[in-house]
Curated annotation (Swiss-Prot):
Renumbered residue ranges of the record's region Disordered: 144-175
Family per record: Belongs to the DAN family.
GO MF annotation terms: BMP binding; cytokine activity; receptor ligand activity
Role description: May act as a tumor suppressor. Cytokine that has an axial patterning activity. Acts like bone morpho-genetic protein (BMP) antagonist in embryonic explants. Blocks the bmp2 activity.
Name of this chain's protein: Neuroblastoma suppressor of tumorigenicity 1
Location of the CTCK domain: 35-124
Gene Ontology terms: biological process: animal organ morphogenesis; determination of dorsal identity; sequestering of BMP from receptor via BMP binding
The entry's keywords: Cytokine, Disulfide bond, Secreted, Signal, Tumor suppressor
Length: 175
């Protein structure tokens, strides 16, 4: 039974797992890959709203990629490798922007990825933004991410003269 588990589950995982990052190449032994999180000031904005400056980090570095010419018929597996400097640890924060003059949506919440740590990772390994937003919404018990892809808009408190249909549409967003 254990052998079937190893063959059926672990073998495909091992085959399709991304290769580890490469730190040095034989052709350039004096060069090494590097990737680090650099402090930046990020401007968060939204149409019709006041922008906000926040402190964040950006991933910056030089990671190795290479492609060795192929042969036909192919005698060995393709020799292509790609690493990119990208986040390995981040959190998502809500940044609230004020939107003066917009009575319907006086504030807009933007989800902003705050990068904590970076490293050379296999290209195409980016974490899905929708998946990350889904986790944020699950953790904060707010509206679902499908209702506001990328930001959540706040309406002002309902006035007494508002009809129930108007205040019920709070989760709808206008793009």
């Amino acid at each position: 039974m254990t052998i079937w588990f190893l063959i059926g589950f672990l073998l495909p995982v091992a085959i399709f797992a991304a290769p580890p990052p490469i730190n040095r190449l034989a052709l350039f032994p004096d060069k090494s890959a590097w990737c680090e999180a650099k402090n930046i000031t990020q401007i968060v904005g939204h149409s019709g709203c006041e922008s906000k400056s926040i402190q964040n980090r950006a991933c910056l570095g030089q990671c190795f990629s290479y492609s060795v010419p192929n042969t036909f018929p192919q005698s060995t597996e393709s020799l292509v490798h790609c690493d990119s400097c990208m986040p390995i640890d981040s959190v998502w924060d809500v940044v609230t922007l004020e939107c003066p003059g917009n009575e319907e949506f006086p504030r807009v919440d933007k989800l902003v990825e705050k990068i904590l740590q970076c490293s050379c990772q296999a290209c195409g390994k980016e974490l899905s933004q929708e998946g990350a937003m889904f986790n944020v919404y699950l953790n904060t018990a707010e509206d679902s991410p499908a209702e506001s892809l990328g930001h959540h808009q706040h309406r002002p408190p309902a006035r007494e003269d508002d009809s129930p249909a108007q205040s019920h549409r709070e989760g709808e967003s206008e793009e």
